[in-house]
């Protein structure tokens, strides 16, 4: 870490008095804003000028002007004090309202976020996550929700949007089902019940990808949620086509196995999103950075 030396910093009260007086070009208005006397403002500015060894103001009768050096110094000090104020406000907000309200599609919450949430809690014990599952691809982002996970094409307007990952669709089956009826080549898919999620579209895309013109994609049960379809596959009710990220824990614990090197991209992806007026919210940005890095790390393993 870089070691910073603060030996030549002027007093904060002097900087505040200068910034306010320079903004108003008036000691009187600066005194009103800072709730002190005009004499106190004048004294603080004299201290600052003595510290810097330069004149910051030109005093002409009843008017006040900045010197050229004073103008340059004001621009920098104004920015610094604004950032100091914003940083303090963010910290106080975090202290008084530690909650982070997150909305996610139910399957993403069940399959990935909840199993990993303890990692975030260990890194940020001061932030209390409140998780809401929604029955739709796009998490619900409103005034009560700080941040959401969306599943889609990433074309949402007026939001901060970051893709979490680009995933392939995997053909998954239980080890028991594969032991009874192995899948060695694409033609073997015809011997199995197809499990669908929402629609038959993904199986149609896979059939086209594998050049299986006669695969009957209309047969087999259809589920509204991926976690239900994965459970059906675990219990040997057929083979399922699912996003790798959502099936990661089942693949890792061996309850489902991927068959055939499909390399078919999921046309949709998961995104972390929030409103543009929350770009400086430390809780939101901490969670965004954590989830992006966590998923990226899993991809590299």
Curated annotation (Swiss-Prot):
GO biological process: DNA-templated transcription
Primary location group: cytoplasm
Protein known as: Glycine cleavage system transcriptional activator homolog
One Pfam family, short name: LysR_substrate
Family: Belongs to the LysR transcriptional regulatory family.
NCBIfam families per UniProt: PRK11139.1
Gene: gcvA
Any one GO CC term of the record: cytoplasm
Source organism per UniProt: Haemophilus influenzae (strain ATCC 51907 / DSM 11121 / KW20 / Rd)
Lineage summary: Bacteria, Pseudomonadati, Pseudomonadota, Gammaproteobacteria, Pasteurellales
Lineage: superkingdom: Bacteria
């Amino acid at each position: 870490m870089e070691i910073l030396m603060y030996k030549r910093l002027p007093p904060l009260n002097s900087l505040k008095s200068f910034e306010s007086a320079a903004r108003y070009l008036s000691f009187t208005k600066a005194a009103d804003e800072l709730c002190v006397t005009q004499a106190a403002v004048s004294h603080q500015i004299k201290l600052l000028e003595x510290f810097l060894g330069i004149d910051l103001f030109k005093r002409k009768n009843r008017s006040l002007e900045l010197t050229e050096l004073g103008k340059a110094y004001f621009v920098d000090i104004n920015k610094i004090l604004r950032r100091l104020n914003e940083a303090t406000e963010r910290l106080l907000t975090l202290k008084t309202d530690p909650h982070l309200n997150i909305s996610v599609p139910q399957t993403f919450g069940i399959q990935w976020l909840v199993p990993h949430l303890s990692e975030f809690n260990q890194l940020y014990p001061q932030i209390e996550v409140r998780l809401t599952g929604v029955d739709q691809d796009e998490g619900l982002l409103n005034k009560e929700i700080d941040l959401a996970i969306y599943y889609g094409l990433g074309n949402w307007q007026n939001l901060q949007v970051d893709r979490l990952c680009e995933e392939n669709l995997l053909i998954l089956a239980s080890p028991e089902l594969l032991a009874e009826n192995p899948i060695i080549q694409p033609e073997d898919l015809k011997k199995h019940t197809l499990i669908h999620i929402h629609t038959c579209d993904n199986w149609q895309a896979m059939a086209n990808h594998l050049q299986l013109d006669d695969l009957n994609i209309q047969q087999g049960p259809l589920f509204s949620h991926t976690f239900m379809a994965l459970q059906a596959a675990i219990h040997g009710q057929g083979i399922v086509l699912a996003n790798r990220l959502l099936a990661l824990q089942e693949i890792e614990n061996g309850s489902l196995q991927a068959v055939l090197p499909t390399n078919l991209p999921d046309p949709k992806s998961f995104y972390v999103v929030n409103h543009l007026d929350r770009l400086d919210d430390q809780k939101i940005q901490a969670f965004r950075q954590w989830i992006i890095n966590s998923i990226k790390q899993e991809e590299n393993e």
